[in-house]
Regions:
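Glycine-rich, basic loop-to-helix element that forms the pyrophosphate-binding segment
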Residues: 66-82
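C-terminal catalytic/acceptor-binding lobe
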Residues: 22, 154-157, 161-167, 171-247
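Conserved donor-nucleotide/metal-binding helix-loop-beta segment in metal-dependent transferases, i.e.
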Residues: 99-117
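Short beta-strand-to-loop element that shapes/binds the nucleotide-sugar donor at the catalytic cleft/hinge
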Residues: 118-132
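Cell-envelope/extracellular polymer assembly enzymes that use nucleotide-activated donors
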Residues: 6-8, 37
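Short beta-strand-to-loop acidic/aromatic patch adjacent to the donor-nucleotide binding site
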Residues: 85-95
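A conserved acidic beta->alpha catalytic loop
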Residues: 42-50
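Short, well-formed alpha-helical segments that are part of the catalytic scaffolds
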Residues: 16-31
Length: 247
C-alpha cells in the first residue's frame, strides 16, 4: 500500500444514517493513503446503513449485527473482521476537514511505540486537564503527547477517530470483558501507553445532540442524579483499584 501502510477503516454505526453518510463522504474525500477497505458495523442491524454507503468511490463493506450489542461488543465484533496490522477507528458522527492525517499519524506512531493512537480532534475540545499540553514534534509531525498521570484512567486511549496498531488491541483480549472506554484506557495506561493529538486538527464532531444509548449500560448520564451516581461508582472503583494495587 502507499506509504508502506496497510490498514483498514473500522467504523461503528447505530441508526444515525444521515450522519453515517456525512461521515463516509468526508472520510472518502480526505483519506490521503488508501485503505484496504472500509468496514462499517451497524449495531442493531438496520439495513439503512447499506444505503448510506452506496455510490461512494471506496471499497466499503457493511456488516449488519443481529440485534443490539452495545459499543464494546460491537467494536470486538468489528475488529474480528479486520486482517490488516493497522486500523483507522471511526464512528458514525464525525466530519473530516482536511487531508494528510493518515500519513502524519503513521509517522508519529512509528516514531513513538508508547503512543496507542493519534487523535485528530482540536485539543481545545478535549478534557480541560490536558488542554495546556505543550506542542512538540514526533516523527516529524507536530502534535501534543498527553500525560497519562493527569487522570486515574484517561489519556492513554480513546475511540475517537484515529489510526492505531491492531497488535496493541489484540494484546488486551476482548474489550467488552474489560469494560467501557475509561477501563480500556486504564488497561493501556498500565501497559505504559499514552495517546497523541495532532496539532493541526482534521475532524469535527457532528453528533453532539444525537447520542445513542448503550444497552450494556455504558450510556452517558442525562440527569443530575444519574451523573452523581456515575461519579460515585467511578470513585468507588478507583478506591478498590488502589487498595488492590497496594495489597
Amino acid at each position: 500500500m502507499a506509504g508502506g501502510l496497510v490498514y483498514t477503516v473500522a467504523l461503528t454505526s447505530c441508526g444515525r444514517h444521515d450522519l453515517l453518510r456525512r461521515t463516509l463522504r468526508s472520510l472518502v474525500a480526505t483519506l490521503d493513503l488508501p485503505p484496504r477497505e472500509i468496514v462499517v458495523f451497524e449495531d442493531g442491524g438496520d439495513p439503512g446503513a447499506r444505503a448510506a454507503a452506496e455510490g461512494l468511490d471506496a471499497p466499503i463493506r457493511v456488516i449488519l449485527a443481529e440485534g443490539r450489542l452495545g459499543q464494546m461488543r460491537a467494536i470486538d465484533r468489528l475488529y474480528a473482521e479486520i486482517g490488516t496490522p493497522w486500523a483507522f477507528h471511526c464512528e458514525d458522527d464525525w466530519e473530516f476537514t482536511r487531508t494528510g492525517y493518515v500519513a502524519e499519524s503513521h509517522a508519529l506512531l512509528a516514531a513513538r511505540p508508547d503512543v496507542s493512537t493519534v487523535s485528530l480532534r482540536p485539543i481545545g475540545e478535549l478534557n480541560p486537564l490536558i488542554r495546556d499540553t505543550p506542542e512538540t514534534v514526533a516523527g516529524g509531525v507536530r502534535c501534543h503527547l498527553l500525560d497519562p498521570a493527569r487522570h486515574p484512567e484517561y489519556f492513554s486511549y480513546t475511540f475517537n477517530p484515529g489510526l492505531r496498531r491492531l497488535s496493541d488491541l489484540h494484546a488486551l483480549g476482548p474489550l467488552a470483558a474489560i469494560g467501557g472506554e475509561a477501563d480500556v484506557s486504564l488497561a493501556f495506561k498500565r501497559r505504559g501507553f499514552r495517546y497523541a493529538v495532532l496539532a493541526e486538527p482534521a475532524v469535527r464532531h457532528v453528533g453532539w445532540e444525537r447520542h445513542v444509548d448503550d444497552p450494556a449500560g455504558l450510556s452517558r448520564p442525562r440527569t443530575p442524579w444519574a451523573r452523581w451516581a456515575r461519579s460515585a461508582r467511578k470513585r468507588f472503583r478507583r478506591l478498590r483499584r488502589r487498595f488492590s494495587d497496594d495489597a
